[in-house]
Amino acid sequence: MPSIKRALISLSDKTGAVEFAQTLTKLGVEILSTGGTAKLLADAGVPVIEVADYTGFPEMLDGRVKTLHPKIHGGILGRRDLDEHVAKMEEHGIGNIDLVCVNLYPFAATIAKPNCTLEDAIENIDIGGPTMVRSAAKNWKHVAIVTDTADFPAIAAELEANNGALSDKTRFNLSRKAFSHTAQYDGMISNYLTSLSDDVLSGEPEIGEFPSQFNQSWIKVQDMRYGENPHQRAAFYRDIDPAAGSLSAYKQLQGKELSYNNIADADAAWEAVKSFDAPACVIVKHANPCGVAVAADTLTAYKLAYVTDTTSAFGGIIAFNREVDGETVKQITDNQFMEVLMAPKFTAEALEIAAAKKNVRVLEVPLEAGANRFELKRVGGGLLVQTPDIHRLNRADLKVVSKRQPTEQEWNDLMFVWNVAKYVKSNAIVFGKGGQTYGIGAGQMSRVDSTRIAARKAQDANLDLNGACAASDAFFPFRDGVDVIAEQGIKAIIHPAGSMRDQEVFDAADEHGIAMVVTDVRHFRH
């Protein structure tokens, strides 16, 4: 492991650069730098040589040409183990550059600005940076490349412990990270440019929602024991730029390793529970809510959600959108077996009680507003991409199509069951009252079958549906679903309408004295 003698540091994100450069200086490393990075280091008293002085060639073209010079790239790419390379470098006065610390122009931050022009974006496409990164990464056996300032402390510690040298393992891992960095950067540029309309020369082009070539980067969080079934292999990846409040930000406080199905179900539970403003509990089984409730506190919300379907809740995922206390956890552990318990925070007492069930996975997830930019679904040889279903119902946009108007309580219940229905697999029917689900019918090919299942769930739970409300994630194709709902004593229905037989459905509601509200928004979930 030869010691590092010369480093080139050129950073957009300069976090920790001074401290790292000071460590290099103590180890006798000569530092080359450019522009703002050179000034930062010099102002901090770090000896630094400007790249222009080192190459004898000035920075030019508004900074577009700074490091694109044989003395830089020859010093990075030259193989120390090949006599021919060594001789050529000596012939042309090219010295070795053993360490390159580069991160790239902030392209993502630039295009995220609301008034970003195409010219702004183009000027923030880094050329020299990726070239140095790839050169150093390619020659990893002889050169170390650092693209993430978060790595500075670990690299500095290893250099100090090894007389200024880095191990082959470290250099190779840094190389892999560097190539991933430039791949993600180029993918981001491609996404932006291929999202633009073709009228580039006639003015500012419009930015479309979907690029003509779709690039995304993911970071592996863990290999899993198996996938959806034991014979399938699986891993969990995190979006390189995850949305705020995403499940991927979870912190596991106790329990066994999360399985593939745990993560899938936990995501369904978390997306549902964080959609409620009031304290809420969502219990999920096989990615479907089997009980949902809102209440004044987490304990009450859990009790109400649990009674919807105590059988299906067994082995489920339980999610809250408020801090969970010890009393709530005790009630849960007394009632049922669960796979995952999740909330934005737990009290010390809650964690102490949960610890008695050492296999239960307890997750803390930041409760922040946010949604993935895109939802992805693989099909054979392709990918379906759509924006997420984050529509929030506004009562002012709803239309009453029945003779009877909903009461104020029915309005509240309709809003609640409609929000639950959005997270239930289609065909979805949800019955509820007083902020509590009374019956959930999910995933049936026939809407009337989902309706019958929801009714049976309420009957099994001894929940009286008289005066309850119903939500359907899509229109009723026939009046039979309304007739079954009416048989249960339900007094108000919310659904999107849009069927050829809408009027028959509306008439059925009037025949039964049901208040019917239409949304003009559908919530299919497959």
Swiss-Prot record:
Pfam families linked to this entry: AICARFT_IMPCHas, MGS
Domain notes: The IMP cyclohydrolase activity resides in the N-terminal region.
Keyword field contains Nucleotide-binding: no
Highest classification ranks of the organism: Bacteria, Pseudomonadati, Pseudomonadota, Betaproteobacteria, Neisseriales
Keyword annotations of the record: Hydrolase, Multifunctional enzyme, Purine biosynthesis, Transferase
Bilayer-spanning residue ranges: none
Catalytic reaction(s) noted: (6R)-10-formyltetrahydrofolate + 5-amino-1-(5-phospho-beta-D-ribosyl)imidazole-4-carboxamide = 5-formamido-1-(5-phospho-D-ribosyl)imidazole-4-carboxamide + (6S)-5,6,7,8-tetrahydrofolate; IMP + H2O = 5-formamido-1-(5-phospho-D-ribosyl)imidazole-4-carboxamide
Stated name of the protein: Bifunctional purine biosynthesis protein PurH
Ranges of residues in domain MGS-like: 1-147
Pathway: Purine metabolism; IMP biosynthesis via de novo pathway; 5-formamido-1-(5-phospho-D-ribosyl)imidazole-4-carboxamide from 5-amino-1-(5-phospho-D-ribosyl)imidazole-4-carboxamide (10-formyl THF route): step 1/1; Purine metabolism; IMP biosynthesis via de novo pathway; IMP from 5-formamido-1-(5-phospho-D-ribosyl)imidazole-4-carboxamide: step 1/1
Any one Gene Ontology cellular component term annotated for this protein: cytosol
HAMAP family: PurH (MF_00139)
Biological source species: Neisseria meningitidis serogroup C / serotype 2a (strain ATCC 700532 / DSM 15464 / FAM18)
Residue ranges the record marks as coiled coil: none
EC number: 2.1.2.3, 3.5.4.10
Stated family: Belongs to the PurH family.
Domain of life assignment: Bacteria
